[in-house]
Each structure stands twice: as structure tokens, then as C-alpha cells.
Regions:
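N-terminal assembly/transducer modules of large multi-domain enzymes
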Residues: 1-45, 103-108, 112-273
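Short beta-strand/loop element within the Bergerat-fold HATPase_c
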Residues: 44-55
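Short beta-strand element(s) in the Bergerat
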Residues: 56-58, 147
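Flexible ATP-lid and adjacent glycine-rich G1/G2 motifs of the Bergerat
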Residues: 59-119
Length: 273
């Protein structure tokens, strides 16, 4: 940051030990979720992840997004009450920035539509007499468009492990049956895995297939990393029934799942098809 430019400092009431159990993947999950949600809201606002192994930088880019300064307020979100997005609670990138700074990463936002750069780091606050997270915002001329979040000091191993978070990393391909509720993932290696809009979530159900649900059908807990098993099994029953009717899953396979009392079809007896 140049010393002769006008810089505004925005202090957040977040101390370094907040969400102390969060990992690198937890933080990136928040950022990926924000990026994919933006694409859901506007199909032209494409989201992509770019990793530069030489520079050890990870860039999360949306082609049309722009950040307003009031999004630094906790609870402030443009996605609240939108049933097609995963995020609902408005904490997102601020918490990710805190965790990544704590882990020794850099976290910089290139808010290109406003010609701004937002740099984050911890500072000793004179107001709060405590170390807190702050964003330093200054003007920057650029021909680039959209929004780019750049995370520095990211190792190859950390990048490669993001497949545990996001189903669509690095052109990941898989066999699937499309339904109105989302995708049934047919590949055996995904058995039991649950995703919502491509993002992995924990689920206690013992499932025969993997599933990638549309957000509006699955209720997530506040941490957005866990879901309600009853809700999941209710929707998987509907998905299996639809796929069976379409011929994407053989009726013999469905009958076997029912006989084995698989959680995928647990709610068959409660639903009418």
C-alpha cells in the first residue's frame, strides 16, 4: 500500500480467536458459497477459482459482482430470504477474512467496479483496546471488471484439498441423474456424500448415493455446514422416485434399497407417487 494515498480504515468487532475451530477449508467454503450464490442470482455473473502455484495465490472471481461498504456490517447480506442461495446469515467473507489472516494468509478484495482495493489485517484498536480485524480501503485505477478476492500464501496441498469442499473444483466430472430437487450422484466414490449447490455439508444419514441438492429444498444449520437428516431423507425419497419413473435408476435397484431400509428411501412409506 502506498503511503501517499487516502486510506480509510474500517474496524470490525471481530477478535482473532473468533470461530477458533475453523480451518482453511471452512474459510474457503464461505468464499466459494458467496461466489456460487452470486452466479445463482445472475447467470451472467460467472464464478471461477484461479490458482497460481508459482505465486501461491488463490483468486475467487465473479465477473459482475460489486461490494458495498455496508457489507462489512455483520448480518448485512443481499441474499437474505432468497431460497435459491445457500447463504442466508450475512457473515460470509468477513469471517473468512478473519480465519485466513489468523492462519497466516493474506486476504485482499479487488472491488473493481468501484475502483477500490480492500486489504484486511489485524490491528490493535485504540477504541476497543483489543486486537481486531480491520479493512483498509483505498482507490485504485483499473481496467478490470467484477470482483476478485485474492488469498495469498496458499500451498498446492491446500488448493488440492478444496475438492472436499466444492463438487465442481477443477472440472470435476461425475455421473448423475437430474431431478427437480437436484442431482443424484451415481458414481460409487460419492456414495453418502451430500452437497447443496455444489458445497459439501455434513449429514448423519447413511445414503447409498451421493446427492447435490438445490438450496431451496434443504434447511441448513446456522454454520451452513450441517443439515437436518430427516429433511435430507424426505427429499432423497422424492428424488429416487422421480429418477425411477424416468428410468435413470432401475426399479430393481430401488426395490433392493427399500428391502435394505436404506435412508435414501426411508420416506417412501410416507409419500404417495
Amino acid at each position: 500500500m502506498k503511503k501517499d494515498i487516502d486510506v480509510k480504515c474500517y474496524e470490525l468487532t471481530l477478535t482473532p480467536n473468533y470461530v477458533s475451530d475453523w480451518t482453511f477449508n471452512d474459510a474457503l467454503r464461505e468464499l466459494i458459497q458467496n461466489g456460487t450464490d452470486q452466479e445463482v442470482l445472475d447467470k451472467e455473473n460467472k464464478f471461477q477459482i484461479i490458482y497460481n502455484g508459482k505465486e501461491k495465490t488463490l483468486r475467487l472471481v465473479n465477473q459482475k459482482s460489486v461490494l458495498k461498504i455496508n457489507t462489512l456490517l455483520l448480518g448485512r447480506s443481499s441474499k437474505a430470504n432468497n431460497e435459491d442461495t445457500v447463504g442466508q446469515f450475512g457473515e460470509g467473507y468477513k469471517i473468512a477474512a478473519l480465519v485466513l489472516n489468523r492462519l497466516g494468509k493474506t486476504f485482499t478484495i479487488y472491488n473493481n467496479e468501484k475502483g477500490e482495493i480492500w486489504e484486511s489485517r489485524f490491528k490493535n484498536s485504540e477504541k476497543w483496546l483489543e486486537k481486531i480485524l480491520a479493512f483498509y480501503v483505498y482507490k485504485h485505477d483499473t481496467d478490470n471488471s467484477g470482483l476478485c478476492i485474492e488469498v495469498g500464501n496458499v500451498t498446492h496441498e491446500e488448493f488440492n484439498n478444496l475438492y472436499k469442499v466444492w463438487l465442481h473444483l477443477e472440472n470435476c466430472d461425475y455421473s448423475k441423474a437430474e431431478t427437480g430437487y437436484g442431482e443424484i450422484i451415481l458414481d460409487e466414490e460419492y456414495a453418502g456424500e451430500v452437497y447443496v449447490n455444489g458445497l459439501f455439508v455434513d449429514c448423519n444419514s447413511d445414503l447409498k448415493y451421493g446427492y447435490n441438492f438445490k438450496p431451496k429444498y434443504i434447511r441448513l444449520e446456522r454454520d451452513r455446514k450441517t443439515c437436518d437428516s430427516w429433511n435430507v431423507e424426505e427429499i432423497t425419497s422424492l428424488m429416487i422416485a422421480e429418477a425411477m419413473v424416468k428410468g435413470d435408476i432401475p426399479i430393481e435397484q430401488v426395490r433392493k434399497m427399500i428391502e435394505e431400509r436404506a435412508d435414501d428411501v426411508y420416506h417412501f412409506e410416507f409419500n404417495t407417487y
